[in-house]
């Protein structure tokens, strides 16, 4: 499944990596121009601050805009994206990306019909959500060693200390 999983690894890597410059510079895609990190914007404030349902609502509101949350989120986008695209550290990147996506899914969970204020949530599905799909999709490249196809995974695996630490491949 190596080539098939690489077909998945590369676009997933691009999804994560692209978000980094967009959120850093405010390129006008998910992050409006003038709202990037370099302009003083917070990559977590909008998403986490707008959580409007679920048992974790107050927790995510307290994390929104916090410096530690912004730094971890940006580091995650850059690290997961670069590792997946390069094909190195795919297992570690997949684990980190899965945790990130699971937390983002949890922030929007439950995909209820109504928000905590009673207004409609506009949720289209009671379970499946794109963050959950991304989290599950990250498992395939990690499980199949997809970094060796169209990536630097073979060279990475030859590094002596990595041969003893398979989780870092």
Where are each of the predicted segments found?
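Extended, low-polarity transmembrane helix blocks
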Residues: 1-51, 55-79, 86-169
């Amino acid at each position: 499944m190596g080539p098939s999983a690489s077909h998945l690894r590369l676009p997933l890597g691009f999804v994560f990596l692209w978000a980094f410059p967009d959120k850093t510079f405010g390129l006008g895609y998910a992050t409006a121009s003038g709202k990037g990190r370099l302009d003083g914007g917070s990559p977590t404030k909008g998403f986490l601050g707008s959580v409007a349902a679920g048992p974790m609502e107050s927790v995510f509101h307290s994390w929104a805009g916090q410096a530690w949350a912004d730094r971890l989120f940006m580091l995650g986008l850059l690290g997961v994206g670069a590792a997946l695209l390069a094909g190195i550290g795919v297992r570690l990147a997949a684990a980190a990306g899965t945790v990130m996506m699971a937390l983002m899914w949890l922030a929007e969970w439950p995909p209820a019909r109504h928000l905590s204020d009673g207004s409609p949530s506009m949720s289209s599905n009671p379970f499946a959500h794109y963050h959950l799909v991304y989290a599950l999709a990250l498992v395939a490249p990690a499980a199949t060693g997809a970094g060796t196809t169209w990536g630097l995974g073979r060279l990475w695996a030859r590094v002596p200390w990595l041969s003893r630490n398979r989780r870092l491949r």
